[in-house]
């Protein structure tokens, strides 16, 4: 359960950081 959730969260954070 935590695997996919962490993946989605990491992806979202990565996108925000890349946008900055």
UniProtKB/Swiss-Prot annotation:
Expression (tissue specificity): Expressed by the skin glands.
Q: From what superkingdom does this record's organism come? A: Eukaryota
Q: Which organism is it from?
A: Bombina maxima
A GO CC annotation recorded here is:
extracellular region
The cellular location(s) given in this protein's UniProt record come to: Secreted
Role summary: Has antimicrobial activity.
Q: Does the keyword Secreted apply?
A: yes
Signal peptide residues on this chain, from the entry's feature table: none
Q: Which InterPro entries match?
A: Bombinin
Q: Write down a Pfam family by its short name.
A: Bombinin
- Record's keyword annotation contains Cytoplasm: no
Report the family membership: Belongs to the bombinin family.
For biological process, the GO terms are: defense response to bacterium
Name by which UniProt lists this protein: Maximin-Ht
Keyword list (alphabetical) reads: Amphibian defense peptide, Antibiotic, Antimicrobial, Secreted
Give the organism's phylogenetic lineage: Eukaryota, Metazoa, Chordata, Craniata, Vertebrata
């Amino acid at each position: 359960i935590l695997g996919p959730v962490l993946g989605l969260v990491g992806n979202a954070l990565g996108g925000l950081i890349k946008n900055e």
